[in-house]
Structures are given as structure tokens and as C-alpha cells.
From Swiss-Prot:
Signal peptide range in chain numbering: none
Sorted UniProt keywords: Cytoplasm, Decarboxylase, Lyase, Porphyrin biosynthesis
Disulfide bridges in this chain: none
Pathway: Porphyrin-containing compound metabolism; protoporphyrin-IX biosynthesis; coproporphyrinogen-III from 5-aminolevulinate: step 4/4
Record-linked SUPFAM superfamilies: UROD/MetE-like (SSF51726)
Name used for this protein in its record: Uroporphyrinogen decarboxylase
Amino acid sequence: MTALKNDRFLRALLKQPVDVTPVWMMRQAGRYLPEYRASRANAGDFMSLCMNPEFACEVTMQPLDRYPQLDAAILFSDILTIPDAMGQGLYFETGEGPRFKKVVSTLADIEALPIPDPHKDLGYVMDAVSTIRRELNGRVPLIGFSGSPWTLATYMVEGGSSKDFRKTKAMLYDNPQAMHLLLDKLAQSVTSYLNGQIMAGAQAVQIFDTWGGNLSAAAYQEFSLAYMRKIVSGLIREHEGRKVPVILFTKGGGLWLESIADAGADALGLDWTCDIGEARRRVGGQVALQGNMDPTVLYAKPEAIRTEVGRILASYGKGTGHVFNLGHGITPEVNPEHAGAFLRAVHELSAQYHE
């Protein structure tokens, strides 16, 4: 495999010295970029973009070609590929987001769910990873990812996205045995899926627990964090002669940083409601931190974006262990020039913290 020309993202996750704070953006390959919208039109629809390794590679590379400051690429895919491979029948309604043809509502439904084989059932994702690695040719590391079991379960039980998760939470409290079986199957599926991505060439992996923050503190521990801990313990942590860092990101998890830091990952993702300096004081001895600018700051003028970047860098303070990112995904209406101003500001303003 080609040697990495820029490994500062991996170094920061492992708390090794870096020259500047590395940066990437969740959803960096996305609708805010005109070139992405053109590729999506060529592919026909979102799923065709995900399921064709050449298209997935093309859109993964687009932000890197536009923004030389990006210190990592992230696989272009969707968290719902696993439930789709379990036979749920994923499709996208215009303006409505993801939907499933089948929903999971009974213990019998859950017992019937297969655990997908990453190579047979999700081979298009593995092919995309290896295609992107070839195309990157050592420029920056490639991040693989998955949704967390709890987050995937919400979509499977609700049949799509939800504001209140009433069906999922009813199952959790009425029939915890069924919910635990579903989460256990998903944890096994996520573990083999992420290990497949690592073997195909992903150099770090992130677990997106988008809806973990909607649980009570007790339910979060039992129904989300316990299964992420199980996944982390089963992941391949070294490949191609170097460590493969693991990032856990629970949106809304700021109250539970200590217990998330104990789950065994190398880094925690933070949303923007959490002060990164306070997070460092609480768990920075154990884990690296990733985040955490409010994505809507990108609607402000470049000078205001730069000021906010400076504030977050100062809050974190000197030394390594910080990967700059947004606190959630970049939104479709952002001006690409503002994203560029954000990325430039991170590198320009962070050098002083690494002298």
C-alpha cells in the first residue's frame, strides 16, 4: 500500500504530535457542492450513487479536490445500508428522507432478520472503499463508518426518520427482550461491516450514534452505549502496520462523556452544545476529541467563521488530541466558499497551539 503523505488526522486521534490541528467535515461530500449535485443527477438517484463504487469514489474525492486543507476523506455511503442488507427495502422519498418497505415490530420480525455478510451482501461498500483508497494514493487517510445499533434500530422500527421515536421507545420499555435481540444482531452486523471496511482499506472508523442523545441517561447506557462498547471490543485495531483509530459520536451525549470515554474508542465526537475545553478537562486524558463547531456558523460571513474557529481552538488549548470538525453534518444550503474559509482558518489559526 502507498505510504500516507498526510497522516496528521490519524496522529491527532492517537494523541501524537502534529504541526496544525487536522480538519474534516461530516457530510463533506454532499449537496452543498455543485459538483456533487451534478454527479447525483448523472447517477439518477441517491442509492445509485451509493451502490456504484465508481460514483461513490467520484463524490468522495470532490471535496478533497476543491479543498486542499482537508486532512481526511470519508467513504460516501449511508448508515442505512445495513438494514437494507437485512431485507428491510430501503428507498428515499423526495422531501421525506429514508423509508423502509418493511418495518420491524414484533419479536418474530427480529428473529427472522439475517446478519449480513459484508462481502456478499454489502460488497458494493467494500468495493467503494478499495476504489477510493486506490484513487487517494496516500493523499490523506480514508474514514469508514457505520450507524450505531440504537440509531439503526430507530429507523427499522419507525420505518424511517422520526421526531419522537414513539414505536421504538414503546418497544424498548414494553418489550426490552425484543429490543435487546435487535440491538445484539445490529451490533454483530456493524462489527463485521466495519471490519470489512478496515480490511478493504479504511484507516479509521467512526460510529454515528445520531439518536443516542434522545434516550434517558439509564436507557442510553443499556440500549446504546453497551452495544457500541461491544462493537469497539470486536474491531480490528491494527492493519497495514498501523493502528486503526475508532471514533464514537453520540449527538447529544455531552452529559455522558466519562462513560463514553470508557467504551474503549480512541476518540469522541462532540456536538456543538458541549464546550470542548470542558470536555478536554473531563476526558482528554483518556481520549482524543473531534468537533465541534455549530454547522450553522457556516451561514455567517467568513470573518465570523474565523472568529468562532479561533474561539474553539483557544478553548481546547495547546497540544494534540483534537481533530477539528463540525458538531454535525454540513447542511445543503451552505456556500462552498464559506466551507473553504472554515477549513483555511483551522490550519492558519491552529499552528500556534502546536509549537
